[in-house]
Amino acid sequence: KSEFIKMAKKLYDADVLQSLCLSIQSRHETSLKLVKRATMDVSKDFKYYIDKCREMDLPYSTEMMLGNPGETVDTWKDGYLDVVRSGVSCDIYAVALLPGAELASAKSREENELEYELVQFPGVANPKYRPVREYMEQVVSTKWMNRDEMREMFAWTWCTRLGHEFNFTRELANYCETHDIIDLLGFYNKFHEYIANSDGVLNQYYKDHLLFRTDKYEYTLALKNIGFRDSLSLDDREGVKEDINVFASQFDIPADLVEFNDASMFRGDVRYPWRVKFDYDFVNDIDEEVEIEFTETAYGRATATRDNLIQGMSDVSDDYKYKKRMVCTRTAGKIVNS
């Protein structure tokens, strides 16, 4: 099972591959059986594969499909949290009824009560330069998840992905779960509610980069568009911290946890290794003053084709490439003084 991981590691070391994608579609067994993916090795042995990637120091990601038959609101939330809890970057796609696919058959449509909307096929061509557009039948409702629930799941996933997968609230959420303040599911249900109803920078990005697409059922595009992370992380970082401080005020947590949470995600305005003093030892979870040294890691990296193209441009500065490559990745902290 590890042979293709070893090959991927060679490609990564040669700077040909930025990360290995381990596609799983869903963590829900019933859903995988209904779409005939229950025998996929990666789905069954997901932990083995990610542990092997970590052992080889190989960045990795996965893919999931939202809208498969059998998937409910609860199973989707549990499955997605199971994936991101393990630190895996995850591309998410809406389910489409493609010509010739068994899922698109008349029998499947009737049995699974599939409803669809015609949506522009994502990634085929930029309509600005190619006037002929291609459309697909994108699933927007099933027997297990109605139209409103599915749209809500894409919004919930956008917020949860922002917080945990893109690391804006990962340490905050982990601390709350570890200390029995609130589990990850409850935390991100509240985070979604906060973003949707607040008036800060996170709500503005939510409206500009999610809602304007989900209102048109462009679910895949809504989650594939991750370019906003650059400005949110590098340019609007202080506004994000202010938002997170307001959100976190409802929890009984150490005063500087939000600062530690922020330092645990790559910053483009500091030089690493970077040292910060805290009143609490978050590394060892001990109530004592410490100084923590943060260094970069590649973990949590998520890239798009545009990002890969930038890495090969000769007229783009190395510093800019570096920041683009590391944006929203996790840092590693170690105690240097206590």
Q: In which residue ranges do the predicted regions lie?
A:
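Flexible glycine/acidic-rich beta-alpha junction loops that bind and position SAM and/or redox cofactors
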Residues: I24-Q25, E29-K36, L66-D74, S86-M150, ...
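Generic recognition of stable, solvent-exposed alpha-helical segments in well-folded globular domains
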Residues: E3, D41-Y48, E71-D78, M145-A155
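Short intrinsically disordered, low-complexity coil segments enriched in acidic
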Residues: K1-K9, D13, P99-G100, K107-E110, ...
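Radical SAM enzyme core and accessory elements
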Residues: E137-S338
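Conserved SAM/AdoMet-binding glycine-rich loop
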Residues: K1-T62, L66-N68
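A generic secondary-structure signal for well-formed alpha-helical elements
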Residues: D57, G87-C90, A94, T160-H164
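Short, charged low-complexity intrinsically disordered segments located at boundaries
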Residues: F4-K9, R27, M40, N112, ...
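Short, electropositive alpha-helical surface patch
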Residues: A8-L11, T72-V88, R151-W158
